[in-house]
Amino acid sequence: MTKDYLFEIGTEEMPAHVVSRSVKQLADRTKKYLKENGLSFKDIKTYSTPRRLTILVEDLAEKQDDIDEVKKGPAKKIAQDKDGNWTKAAQGFARGQGMTTDDIYFEELKGTEYAYVHVQKEGKKASDILMGMSDIIKAMTFPTKMRWDSNDFEFVRPIHWMVSLLGSEVVPVKLLDVVAGRKTQGHRFLGDSVVLANADDYEEALKSQYVIADADERKGMILNQIQELVAQHNWKVNIDKGLLEEVTNLVEYPTVFAGSFDEKYLNIPDEVLITSMKDNQRYFEVYDENGKLINHFIAVRNGNSEYLDNVIAGNEKVLVARLDDAQFFYDEDKKYPLAHFVDKLKNVSFHDKIGSVAEHMARVHIIGDYLGKKFNISETEMKDFDRVSDIYKFDLVTSMVGEFAELQGVMGMHYARLTGEDENVSVAIKESYMPTSAEGDLPSTTVGSLLSIADKLDTIISFFGAGMIPSSSNDPYALRRNAYGIVRILLNEGWSLPVKDVLPELIQLLSGKTAAKLPKDAEAENEIADFIRDRVKQQLQVEKYDYDVIDAVLASSQQDPIQILAAAKTLQMHHDDADFKPVVESLTRITNILKKAKYRNAAKVDESLFQDVSEEELNAGVNALEENTDLSIADLYKGFVELQPVINNYFESNMILDKDEKVKNNRLAQLLKVNNLADRMGDLSKLVIK
């Protein structure tokens, strides 16, 4: 027989961002615990609110299965010595089955006698096993934890009650001074405590006390109520998934309402209004039918519709206070020219080991000028870059960004427009921060892309030069995100940048023009290049390339993200072609021969030493590929497909490791040329060939 098992942890209000992940953790740990203890069940359903983490184990077996089985042990000659005494092997076998040597008997199997025991064990009751739920609670982890009273135990928030019901039976799990029972708590202000007769009563019992325990149901209620409001007023609302998740986990009984503010505040940039509403107050901003931001907002209260007018008025008052501040900051900032703010940047620290923001911008200017030539950026766009790189951090010292730090770059764009800067310059100020997250939007302009790469590259060079290198577990300055941003922008723009090749030139340009420490030698430069190159793997994983393709292309000596991606595309595209396996096997054979011979000497191939026409054919084919300076990775692969029969014929017709040392080395030199070309695609030996 089976019963449903309910387990609820009642707490003080938890931060919204930990609720969903915490109840999932509780379910996952319980699932593992039940499986380890041999208790079968159908599924585990989760419930969660800011004040509770709950699981309902559906169709849980009432007890473990009984054990009735015969266990085979060591042969008799190992189980007993010549005098018939039990050996350690026999004793260990019996002990491992929870029995003694008195329980051992012997039976013959294929001419040999073996030790056996008959194990009969009654399964434990589920209620006994579920007493261990307290250990699951103790094992849970959180970003931040609290202690209460004089206990050493830590949890995300103090625990006030627990419910533990197996069907209608209480399983009295105990943690500190809290003993689980059948009483749960309703809404803090609208509901009362409620005694549950059965585990299955949980959801409906809480609804009667103004608690919607199912998070998905609460989310659905919020969405439906928002849509009703929107339809009534012909509004549009962008439902931010993160904000929706947050407000769902802030309330137990959601009621949606609309508020408004004075139209005069609409002169403030939209991003400021949205930040004030969404980030500070957890409101949804509202747009008219044409997508223009209007002076209304939508919010969610934790309660019913009683006294809703008072709630609306209170929320409007709080928002207007924020908007008054924003209006003041905006008006103050507009009083000054950009040069006023730029001049202050020499006194703003980028990092105390690196220098000022002004010095950082100066280095970015140098890096961008260098990269602009590499990327063949137009003269007009480089003129815009020169201007924006001299000013783009100015908004860091504005009043608005001082209050709304998340708007750095955004306010710079708006203030630059107000002072008459070119649109390319204004937009690039905002885009210098992009992408703002791992998979965030990329710059839309060439100038913005160049500025963003130069800014991120200087940041990485400067921090590495100062010895502040990320560890495997710690990256306080988000250098990995910066490196990944560089890779994504390069790939998006189609810009070729073999980082290991350009770093020495860049550092030479920066030398003597900055007080910041720079990488001191080739080893330090290579560390930076490898750090950036490692982020290419992240992009390939995001684009769902096969693991062996990723391993292969990253094992090459190729440094240019564009070429690495091209190699991955080519190998992935042709992976299932009929000729893929023979091509890869031929090239891998060459690699293995060179490794075995330990041949790395890039000597010139001497055609006078050729002894067979196959050598001439291979030489001609390889030379044709080498001489094509515009050869793409895709065309290189096609070239190898055509060359594959030639390579096979070469192996059939020649002894590579010839007795004549000159002939042997000449043939190895030929193979090395092939291998160097193949290396542009990757280490093909890492490919899984079917």
Swiss-Prot record:
Q: Where in the cell is it found?
A: Cytoplasm
Query: Which InterPro entries does this chain map to?
Result: DALR_anticod-bd, Gly-tRNA-synth_bsu, Gly-tRNA-synth_heterodimer
The reaction(s) this protein catalyses: tRNA(Gly) + glycine + ATP = glycyl-tRNA(Gly) + AMP + diphosphate
Q: Main localization of the protein?
A: cytoplasm
Q: What keywords tag this UniProt record?
A: Aminoacyl-tRNA synthetase, ATP-binding, Cytoplasm, Ligase, Nucleotide-binding, Protein biosynthesis
Return one GO MF term. glycine-tRNA ligase activity
Q: Which Pfam families match?
A: DALR_1, tRNA_synt_2f
Please tell me whether the keyword Methyltransferase is annotated for this protein.
Answer: no
Q: Which family does it belong to?
A: Belongs to the class-II aminoacyl-tRNA synthetase family.
Quaternary structure note? Tetramer of two alpha and two beta subunits.
Name-wise, this protein is Glycine--tRNA ligase beta subunit
